[in-house]
UniProtKB/Swiss-Prot annotation:
Superkingdom: Bacteria
Motif (RadA KNRFG motif): 254-258
Gene: radA
Taxonomic lineage from the root: Bacteria, Bacillati, Bacillota, Bacilli, Bacillales
PROSITE patterns documented for this protein: RECA_2 (PS50162)
Protein name: DNA repair protein RadA
EC nos: 3.6.4.-
Length: 457
């Protein structure tokens, strides 16, 4: 007997107006191109069920058993750190990134690593045949009897295969290629992505299966499709980096089961992605000693201190308005710091072009990088280099004061481990904590004092 086809409707994303057919302009709010297709909920789906498939009921929170479910470690410490200690069974993880950055490579390697823990993994590809996936696996030198590969884009066929294989983990590569047969729009459309993600989320919760889904990104770098996609999943990971460079950075921008401040570093090689155990050495290995405009900051990425080089190039402008550019550092932060240098130190920067960069493709957004940015700008402006063994840590206030930062001891220890002998920190961070041997800690109260000591006349 043929399966009854579920009816669809069109809903305005601006005001919620519903229509039986698509319209270019919503008659209720007069917005254009806001009508998207959605499935009419069946009578069965209107009943409330919990994640086990049983009827749901309200329960006092004091009567709910407090059980911390064990995470599954992936044998990839960098990924475990970003996920908060491992994969949570029943969770749904969205992995986004530019084309060719290595999303599929990462997940295929993760799948193989999970099979080493006697877990069954189903890798579903909507972009490659099973033979193509096998060729990629051979290049990456990954294999395993518990790694199942399936090439399909029909969501119902995917659900049947999951029920048959009964995996512990599922990878969907990618969500934009999967389609729901009851939705008439093309795969990758707003309605298809929403319905397919909702169905996969139900599978993850009801069967306690961890599901990784790959998401395409737009040219602006955001996950393609409705913003609802990122709201529905438990964790959103972004894989960043330049395709023409070897290093990749994995960040969590949403994580219901851990911190969103952690960062994992990988290096792309012929055999796939290799973890970088000490990223500070990587980011500093090509630093040119004795160059003006170059400073080093000890930045915290979650619980890990990372040393990053900050480069500044300040030169007289050839046009009426000075140009400002920043890569890896917030543009507004750069403008604020340069304004403080003009007002509190007297640097004439209004007729100077300024270009700043965090080396290695890292994005720095914490306040502790302010002092290093300010010193690098002043160093380039005066064409006077700092010592190659100097490190700068501190937040810069609008009145020119250097404000205290968190976890100063960890930052100083990381800098000392890599051979930095003189470390500038806020005066208020000086205390009873242990200073590493052969390291001079310089406490400064203002940016003027810091520049006098770092760039003496």
């Amino acid at each position: 007997m043929a399966k009854a086809k579920r009816t669809t409707k069109f809903v305005c994303q601006s005001c919620g107006y519903e229509s039986a057919k698509w319209m270019g302009k919503c008659p209720n709010c007069n917005e254009w191109n806001q009508m998207v297709e959605a499935l009419e909920p069946s009578k069965k789906s209107r009943s409330a069920f919990n994640h086990t498939g049983e009827p749901s009921k309200a329960t006092p929170i004091t009567q709910i058993a407090s059980e911390e479910e064990a995470r599954v470690e992936t044998n990839m410490p960098e990924l475990n750190r970003v996920l908060g200690g491992g994969v949570v069974p029943g969770s749904m993880v969205l992995v986004g990134g530019d084309p060719g950055i290595g999303k599929s490579t990462l997940l295929l390697q993760v799948s193989a690593q999970l099979t080493l823990t006697n877990k069954k993994v189903l890798y579903i590809s909507g972009e490659e045949s099973i033979k193509q996936t096998k060729l990629r696996a051979e290049r990456l030198q990954v294999s395993g009897d518990n790694l199942y590969v399936y090439a399909e884009t029909n969501l119902e066929a995917v659900q049947e295969t999951i029920d048959f294989v009964k995996p512990d983990f599922v990878v969907i590569d990618s969500i934009q290629t999967v389609y729901h047969p009851d939705v008439t729009s093309a795969a990758g459309s707003v309605s298809q992505v929403r319905e397919c993600t909702a169905a996969l989320m139900r599978i993850a919760k009801m069967q306690n299966i961890a599901i990784f889904i790959v998401g395409h990104v737009t040219k602006e770098g955001a996950i393609a499709g409705p913003r609802l996609l990122e709201h529905m999943v438990d964790t959103v990971l972004y894989f960043e980096g330049e395709r023409h460079h070897a290093y990749r950075i994995l960040r969590a921008v949403k994580n219901r089961f851990g911190s969103t401040n952690e960062m994992g570093i990988f290096e792309m090689r012929d055999i796939g992605l290799v973890e970088v155990a000490n990223p500070s050495e990587v980011f500093l290995e090509e630093r040119l000693e004795g160059a003006s405009g170059s400073t080093v900051v000890a930045s915290m990425e979650g619980t890990r201190p990372v040393l990053v080089e900050i480069q500044a190039l300040v030169s007289p402008t050839m046009f009426g308005n000075a140009k400002r550019m920043a890569t890896g550092i917030d543009y507004n932060k750069v403008s604020l710091i340069m304004a403080v240098l003009e007002k509190r130190v007297g640097l004439m920067l209004q007729n100077q072009d300024a270009y700043l960069k965090a080396a290695g493709g890292v994005k720095l957004d914490e306040p502790a990088v302010d002092l290093a940015v300010a010193v690098s700008v002043a160093s380039s402006y005066r064409d006077k280099p700092t010592r190659s063994t100097d490190c700068f840590i501190g937040e810069l206030g609008l009145t020119g004061e250097i404000r205290r930062v968190a976890r100063i001891e960890q930052r100083v220890q990381e800098a000392a481990k890599l051979g930095f002998k003189r470390i500038f920190i806020p005066k208020n961070n000086e205390g009873t904590w242990k200073v590493p041997k052969d390291v001079q800690v310089v406490g400064v109260e203002t940016i003027g004092e810091a520049l006098k000591k770092a760039l003496p006349d």
